């Protein structure tokens, strides 16, 4: 399992973000504003008014970490400053903080996936919803870094920018079909990691090779390395066949185009709800630069799905990200990054066994517990 320590000072990394304001006009240090926002989000605050309210209630506590010489910034100041903070600089500070905090072990899965912030859409101002592409450490459920794109279709250009920010030495980087690109595969290898990429119709040559090499009957009765799982949950039964192979003749020419390609894999899923007619099988194809066993393919694919279950779900249900209607300037992106920091802290505190929402409420009520979260 990856080692996670958030002890290296968040305030130190936030203080590196340059302040865009004229020095003689500054009443509240930028690092104080950012730290206040993180703490308020940890405790469940959702908008600028609630963040200001939190600050007034916890000012003595906040002064243990920052200056706050002028007290608490107003909600108008918070909104204005967070809309104008350089999002790229804040992004860099976040990534550097996580590099200082987070050590990965050989073979650890880092899942890269995107999420649209639905609340950032503003029809009246002609602003489309922004899309955040995040790198997620599957072992302990924390975000390692993220970049913004204007829309989901831009993930192809966003992923290379995200990879530049990360320490991936020895990791297995999993990306869905949007990121199944030759340049991205090469960049992952250049970072000292291996790739596991989902293949769909956007790579027709690969998809055709899989269909030719692995018809359904061959997958179910595969004579090579295979791993089968059978799960029952609330009346639903799902059986998954996982197979892996070295590069076969169908992929021989393609292997010269995909740097480092060593393993091809297939996951076929059969699902049935109660006594209903079984659903049509779902087939997913994968290419990897790692020497994967069928069991490792199953584990890595499952860990990639944690992005939906452990990250996106937590952001939407616990931190109510999609309900947030803030979209002025760069505020939506900056506040999304504050949520990621807050969620990392909440995930990192493991002594209290409650869920994210319960941890937030406990932190809001108990300053000692909030201090424990910040000291993880």
Question: What feature does the model see in each segment?
Answer:
Residues 23-33, 276-278, 326-334:
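Structural motif
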């Amino acid at each position: 399992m990856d080692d996670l320590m958030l002890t290296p000072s968040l305030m130190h990394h936030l203080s590196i973000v340059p302040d865009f304001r004229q020095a003689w006009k500054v009443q509240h240090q930028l690092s104080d504003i950012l730290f206040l926002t993180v703490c308020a989000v940890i405790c469940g605050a959702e908008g600028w008014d609630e963040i200001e309210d939190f600050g007034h209630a916890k000012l003595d506590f906040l002064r243990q970490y920052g200056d706050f010489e002028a007290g608490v910034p107003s909600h108008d100041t918070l909104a204005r400053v967070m809309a104008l903070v350089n999002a790229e600089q804040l992004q860099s500070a976040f990534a550097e903080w996580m590099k200082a905090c987070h050590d990965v072990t050989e073979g650890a899965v880092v899942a890269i996936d995107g999420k649209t912030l639905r609340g950032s859409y503003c029809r009246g101002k002609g602003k489309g919803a922004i899309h955040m592409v995040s790198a997620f450490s599957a072992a302990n459920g924390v975000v390692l870094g993220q970049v913004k794109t204007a829309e989901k279709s831009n993930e192809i250009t966003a992923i290379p920018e995200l990879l530049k920010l990360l320490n991936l030495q020895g990791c297995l980087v999993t990306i869905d079909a949007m990121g199944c690109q030759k340049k991205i595969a090469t960049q992952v290898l250049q970072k000292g990691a291996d790739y596991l990429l989902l293949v769909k119709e956007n790579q027709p040559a690969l998809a055709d090779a899989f269909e030719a090499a692995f018809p359904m009957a061959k997958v179910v009765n595969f004579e090579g390395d295979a791993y089968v799982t059978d799960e029952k949950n609330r009346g639903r039964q799902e059986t998954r066949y996982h197979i892996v192979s070295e590069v076969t003749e169908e992929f021989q020419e393609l292997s010269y185009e995909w740097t480092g390609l060593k393993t091809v894999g297939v996951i076929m899923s059969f699902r049935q709800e109660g006594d209903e007619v079984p659903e049509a099988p779902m087939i997913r194809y994968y290419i990897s630069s790692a020497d994967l066993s069928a069991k490792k393919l199953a584990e890595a694919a499952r860990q990639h799905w944690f992005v939906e279950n452990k990250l996106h779900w937590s952001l939407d249900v616990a931190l109510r990200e999609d309900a947030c209607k803030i979209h002025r300037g760069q505020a939506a992106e900056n506040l999304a990054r504050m949520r990621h920091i807050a969620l990392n802290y909440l995930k990192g505190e493991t002594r209290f066994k409650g869920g994210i929402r319960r941890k937030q409420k406990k932190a809001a009520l108990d300053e000692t517990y909030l201090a424990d979260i910040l000291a993880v």
